[in-house]
Amino acid sequence: MSNEIDVNGPIGIFDSGFGGLTVARAVIDLLPNEDIVYIGDTGRYPYGDKDPNDVREYARELAWSLVRDYKAKAIVVACNTAAAALPVHELEAELAADGLHIPVIGVIDPGAQSLVRATRS
């Protein structure tokens, strides 16, 4: 696989099921000219009752599928359980270690940052 990032590639989004579709809808609303690929891992849903190490592997598999199979230029982890088991900065570092400098965005950090801002005012 080439380590070149296709700037015309889609934004890849994954979740353990269908809940991340609300995140996908928000991305579409904010970036209407971008292509989106969504993977809902319904075969292993729900993640909440799974061993965290298994969830880490699921997240890795889904991220690599988005990069390898769909040539995603960015990844959104729309699953709180996956982002807690494999923090987005770790996933981003793993991709970068293979020469893939792809932004990985989660949903936990933005929510926590919003809470911090709201409680400091």
Question: Where in the sequence are the language-model features?
Answer:
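Non-catalytic structural scaffold of enzyme domains
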Residues: S2-S121
